[in-house]
Swiss-Prot record:
Annotated positions binding GTP: 477-482, 580-583, 615-616
Cysteine disulfide partners in this protein: none
Gene: rasef
SMART domains: ARF, EFh, RAB, RAN, RAS, RHO
Superkingdom of origin organism: Eukaryota
Binding site for Ca(2+) 1: 14, 16, 18, 20, 25
UniProt-recorded name of the protein: Ras and EF-hand domain-containing protein
Classification via Gene3D superfamilies: EF-hand, P-loop containing nucleotide triphosphate hydrolases
Coiled coil, from the record: 122-297
Keywords from the UniProt entry: Calcium, Coiled coil, Cytoplasm, GTP-binding, Metal-binding, Nucleotide-binding, Repeat
Molecular function as annotated in GO: calcium ion binding; GTP binding; GTPase activity
Organism: Danio rerio (Zebrafish)
Amino acid sequence: MNHAELRRLFAACDGNQSGRVEYEDFTTVCRELNVPADDIRTLFNKFDLDGDGYINFNDFSSSFQEVSEALNLASLGNCLHSQRRAWDEFENTLDGDVAFYLGRQWDALSELYEGIHSTSDELLLQQFEDLIRALVTEIREHRMESEQLETSLRRTEEVSSSQLAEMEEDLQQQLIHTERRVREEEQKKLDESIAMLQIKHENELADLQTTIERLTKQYQEESKLNTPREDSVKLRAQIKDLMEENEELRASLMKAQMNVSILQVELDKLKNAFTDQKRQHERESDDLKKMVMEFQSYSSHIEMLQEMNKSLYDSNDGLRSALSQENASTKRQLSPRNEVLPRKMKPIRQSTMNQSSFTNEEDTLALVKCWAEKYLDSGVSVQSEMDAMSGIDYDSDDSHHSVETVHHSYSCVPSELEVSEVKPEALRSVARSTVGSISSSLRRRLSAFPVKQNEEDLLDTQDLAPVYRLVLAGDAGSGKSSFLLRLSLNEFRGDIQTTLGVDFQIKKMLVDGEKTNLQIWDTAGQERFRSIARSYFRKAHGVLLLYDVTSESSFLNVREWVEQIRESTDEDIPMCIIGNKVDLRAARPEGSCVSSIHGEKLAMNYNALFCEASAKEGTNVIEAVLHLAREVKKHVKLGRRSESQVKLSLHKRRKTLSNCCGV
């Protein structure tokens, strides 16, 4: 037996993989080979040549030939070799380096495979092989995906570093230009000061020269008149005075030069101080601008939240008053004078309530609760939506929809058996009083809302144009606010602020020749505002889901947004997936942006519309909203048609039951 086979056989005997075979491991192997218990200690001592209490590989290889006949270790080695060869053959059937993909689990899996192979269970062996193949394939796919993500991250870091380098270079150029300009100005001022001092000094020298010439002439004239001795004495005195005056002038000149040097040093200090103060002023100005912008943003959102809180309080008061009035009217209906009439009343529509009659106060309270939940979910909590759509959902006292909704939920008519007992005029008076009480309670509740309508809004509500709610969704930075600004005002701003909470706009469009009002809600894309976005998805008719074509992360998060939308809505609503910022694709390297093919495949998977747009250039902005509005219009019409069919079938079923059973 060669060295490799001996090494493999020694590893099989080494149960704990410690590199040496102890007595317990040797005993286990001997029992598997049916060696008598009396001979185990003798055989172990033959292997343990150095007597240290365990068998290393040198002892094992030296004494193997001597005790191989007793232990039959060769047959054990051949068996292990065949099992190892089976694992190697299976490993060759897999693509790539299996040990590289399995890592530290390779040894355990190979031993498990050898154990299963030794049992000759083909079904279990096939299942284990399929499991290993699937595991290797999945690990390979994960590694490829990790490499792709690392490549994307590396590209993003390179782009960011290049942009930072360009910004630093521009800033450095601006600083150099500013420093050069300041130096030139200060040098010009210094040259002017030195020139003025030189002119002054030259004038003083000219005056001195004139004085010397005048004194020289006087001396010559006096020398002619006086004796030579007196002339010489006077001349010496004059020369001495002139020399003293010349020394004084020189001293004053040196002092002036020293003053100029001191002024130059002070000027340099003032320059440095001016530069530092200018930088400090710029930093403080930037901080102040940021603080002002944050203050304005927080103030606007605080006002919005206060208005929303006020609306919720007013809505709560209205619901309480409506509940109390309904309880009072129920008690009046249960009085002995009207005992015959309520006993035979039945509801006109029961789509929003259970199908029992109004025979007790508990059913009435349940109906009022359903009515409250319906109107709280219809958008009353948002003040801006009330102001914009005051003529549709919650209008003034003359609103047809408000009265009709309350009438369908609460109005009562006599049953068929009651027609013969009660006069029609009395029934009509009772129905009018019931509807009037509910309508008056609704009017009192709505009067608490600060609704302000001008003449144009009243005209719009009279036209009864259909209103659809569209929600803008997507990651932060995908261009939702710019998309809404381009749609509403046909403008683009590069310095638009990040949306905090929600934003709201109304767009009037002609959809298939019909005037349509679109409420478009811009939701914030940050994680902390996801709960706010879910509440708007719940009552939306359609969703504009945006992603940035230059950002793979925003595209990958589209699936998460779709799941949130489906979790928030009771049924599937129309969606339009929009790839924004296509104008930036030409400036990016090929392959770094999300292609339109991937966007189309994703939209097909979710049965949604798809287009690519540019809020900066205005490309496909109106078209995307128009197509989604058409789908929303179709969806709403189908929903109303199915709802009317369900109500009709329920009405027929009740009529059949009443005819059969006399209810």
